């Protein structure tokens, strides 16, 4: 007998089911919410500070002085520009800032010269014209005359501006850039005597003087988050991106470290105990020093938690260690605010005027702290005046505390909040920094980011400059009275910050030079001092490689000596004080020794930053001083400061004891470099604390002369009335810095609205443009374009990789060819393709652009044409008048066109006459003129293209130059060949060729072609364009190609139109491969890209419109036809110096007829047209104009390669299988068997044998993908993008 029982109704089941459901809800809620990180309640002994090794000094000039490498070409260009005017010429030197491979120093490489342009809205200030991301800018002043040793590079305003820029970078939230921690200027005195060029070079730089010491300690547990696991793996984010990464450290209640990214919005609201870094090899890297500066002086950090000794943590994920390294880092001078240091270098240089550039053109200099007298005095005086100004401009202490919630002061909160703010009008707007620097559209009234700091409105709103510390601890001197008497000097008083013990120290200033142990790799003889018959250098500098000592012991070979006797240090202190130095009183009881030889100063500027509540209990009767209130005796260091104030930074929780004691006995580590300031015993609740007489503390091992000096402290402690923490002075409860940011953004928004309004008005006014008739004569067209562009009063320039086209000088501007056939529509087509597919590699961009040299075009013609031909063709490109805010290159070129087409043998007018109509710029017509230019570019008729190309193909119009009459029949060929050879020599290519022979041998021709193809290998970058994916997808074009049909289909569907898809389908559907003669050039908007390796940065596709016109007009690059089908033989560039043979022409013509007989009617019409063009090209190939060097890139010209029949005794290594032809198939320009080894060894071109124009090639086999781009199949596939 069985009975069914329902257990669901029992009480036990209900209870068990209820418990399980409750547990599931709890687990679900715990998984859905993020567990909060609670900082340990006790902030003492957060980690074990026991040292595990010797400490390391952190400063970018600690082990090696900064090195400066200057290009000889940049100096020559600067002298060429300077001699055009009598007054001092201001310009810019551009370069790159890099860390050395051993990470013991930094190197500044200056390789470009920029003449600069006048800044809009300012009288005489200039800005660089071709600045790229990552460029290091050095303002330079060039004067002509006899040099002097008493040259002052900086002005007081320059020093103040440098101080402000260094402080603002350390206080802000922008990405930390080590190059912005060095502000540099130069002064060059230039003298020319006969063939000698004499340069007096003066370099001066301002940097941050604060240093740190890092000591290895035992590992601290780390919470295994995703970030920590990624940094500990071999493929971490820093390794993949090829750069270093940094962030901050906090702790949870179990005293485990939590790694936080610097971009985390909550990072500034957490108590931070240190920093972490990844992608760095050594702890002494300058990147670590910069990260420590940002951690100490950042105004956005809410709370810094330091150890009992005032140190913070550093976790280094080194590239050479599997496990992270742990260090305890401490500032070397705890009570100092942000300090500055002056580095200078002086040297002389002799060059020969007409000599070639040496093989190693980089001139080496070294910046040292052994400063010049006048420069150092001005630096000291500026620091002194700025300190006095800071005291006068300090705001009065406010009696309201930030902890008082009824005070009306709103704390600025940068964390995201879902609820609306009380003041929506000042809601924070994030700045957007674009990451596409390749494309630039520059107006004459552009916004300069530097103008924010120089804006008079900002100055009136911010009554005082930036500060190195947050404002709530920055008013230590506000309520301090003036001293009644000077501090009493004593023998054991700290008078300066000394280096490690030297064998002997005297009483003069030279005794403060640091002792050097390691031979630095920087100590080598410059190459221009060894064996050079062209350069003589007088090392009169105090910072040359021989006279300047090294800055410190390298951690790789020497062991730092830490400990020493206190008596020895006292003797050193007493003997090393420089003579003639007077203490500079920073406040009533704060003084600093100022040394003229070592001008390291700490200048504090009030920072208007946000205020946050104190973590500890506020003490309104205590003064938050900058100094570390530490009393020192002979053998012990005692802390007697409050727990909620810390020197030189805001909200540094320093927990040693709960109340300030009357007697202090706690001992600190002996290697800390601390002294007792005078204001170390504040009056607290009626209790008075005293400090013992000051003794020296053992100096840290890494000290050197570049560090700031310690203050001179008196014996007695004075009572000073404490100032109260002031409130924010900004608008609507915000700080002034935040309000200034919002006001600046509001100003930019208003300006943008006004611009949009003007554009709309101009567009409405020109809604019905009148269509102009197309002139039949090209000269009439040029005159018309000039007349329309004369109305443009404001300059506009749009460019890609601006400056890349100025890599070479013109060979010989004796004759020029017409540029009518390349109109603006072709420029627009080429621009649209290459901008979308171009790779942005900053390193290659910087390396390919050598100099912005406008004058070099006109100067080189004097050397090439023996001085008998003027540089009138390029005179419109020069800018000597200071009234032009931005040069309109395209307009100047059109003006030059009209002048060259009007009359024969007329002298060229100067620049002022050409551009007389461009001086006044009415702003209301600016956008109308801009729209007129854009419409002119976009509405160019295709009929005009055909007329122009037909005219040039039939008869090649050779323009007469605006120069003195020469004898073209006798000297033209010879001059062209000499100019070509000289141009090659200037590029470092030496060709042994007899200049008297006009026709070079075929072996020399091939060698020249191979050399020209490998001149600039670093600029060869694989790009994404139509040729790139067609080559990748077809194994017939690439010897080791792979089948990437799906990717090719997807890209073709997205980027190609119907006609291009049909042509690609026809070219691959034919199994006999007869239709390959349909050149892929017709699928491209121009004929500039003929090969994969031709897609370098110095190719015409990366030039601006105006630059491309300029280069093509003067024969510097090849000219391409704007039509899609007709080939261009007129302006095709040729590497060969031999004329085309008639045999090869007839052979090509015969091959055309055979290919048409085979039934391939698709290309018959095109081949007939090409065959007709061959006849007209026979005489043109003999013309000496074609012997010019047109294309100095890595691409083989797709237009014409003329190679005479081979000789058996002179075999060609590169073109032996290539027959003479007038056009190459772009798809076959595969140069190397392995593309990754393109520019190494003997490069062999054309692995396949090309037979005429048919496009036939020996494919790898029948397995090639012939239907990759079938149109029917493409339309059926889904779009992948």
Curated annotation (Swiss-Prot):
GO terms for biological process: microtubule organizing center organization; mitotic spindle organization; protein localization to centrosome; regulation of centriole replication; smoothened signaling pathway. Residues 390-431, 450-592, 765-790, 879-915 are annotated as: Disordered. Disulfide bonds: none annotated. Keywords: Cytoplasm, Cytoskeleton, Developmental protein. Residues 390-401, 461-475, 528-560, 567-592, 770-790, 891-913 have a biased composition (Polar residues). InterPro entries: Sil. It is found in: Cytoplasm, Cytosol; Cytoplasm, Cytoskeleton, Microtubule organizing center, Centrosome, Centriole. It holds the Pfam family STIL_N. One of its GO terms (cellular component) is centriole. PANTHER family: SCL-INTERRUPTING LOCUS PROTEIN, TAL1 SCL INTERRUPTING LOCUS. Plays an essential role in early embryonic development. Plays an important role in the regulation of centriole duplication. This is SCL-interrupting locus protein homolog.
